[in-house]
Amino acid sequence: MARRFVQLDVFASVPGAGNPLAVVLDAEGLDDAAMQAIARWTRLPETTFVLPAASDEASYRIRIFSPRREVPFAGHPSVGTAHVLLDAGLVAPRRQADGRRLLVQDGIAGKLPLEVAGEGATRTVAVRTPRARVQEIAQPDDARLRGALAGLPLGQLPPVLMDGGRRWWLAELASETALRAATPDWDAIVALAEATDSMG
């Protein structure tokens, strides 16, 4: 069965300049394995799958997949999907009593409001992200972090695992100069992501 999808660059007005995203406009009937296969096929950081809203509160339902797994929330896929659905005329924002126009995205992270301002080329969409929480405080010599932090001059604060719809590690470096000079070990970051069920 043919499926309509759009590939776009979020946060950019020209191709190749923003955050790449694929949006499958009608994902009804696709199972988890099919969605994961499509996300792998696109080879983009994220692919979203749009489904009918499950309640009157929501404008639509969304599932977000990286090439490796489903993720509960991601900012640029949420904003990009809203733009695509608005451009296609598949959703319309609801005007609130205070004049704001909102879409409500329903997904693993819950129902999230997206504020829509303007129209066409001047349209903006802003998402209220899930509140981030500290999941774990680690020691700098934690074996899981050793490869990802190797050679980096750390600051005073310990590394922390955050969860804001997606899990990721944060580590304070000693200075802005250290940050600018850092050369990430991507293989070590991938290993960290796999070992801790995080984005790295």
Give residue ranges: language-model regions.
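Short beta-strand micro-motifs enriched in acidic
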Residues: F11, L51-A53, E115-E119
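Generic N-terminal amphipathic, Lys/Arg-enriched alpha-helix
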Residues: G16-V24
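N-terminal, positively charged, Ser/Thr/Ala/Gly-biased leader segments
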Residues: M1-A17
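Hydrophobic N-terminal alpha-helices or hydrophobic patches in metabolic proteins across all domains
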Residues: V6, E28-R43, T47-D56, L90, ...
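Short beta-strand-to-turn element immediately C-terminal to the catalytic PLP-Schiff-base lysine
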Residues: V23-D26, V50-L51, L170-L173
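Conserved phosphate-donor
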Residues: R43-R61, A188-G200
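Acidic, low-complexity central loop/insert segments
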Residues: A37, F65-A195
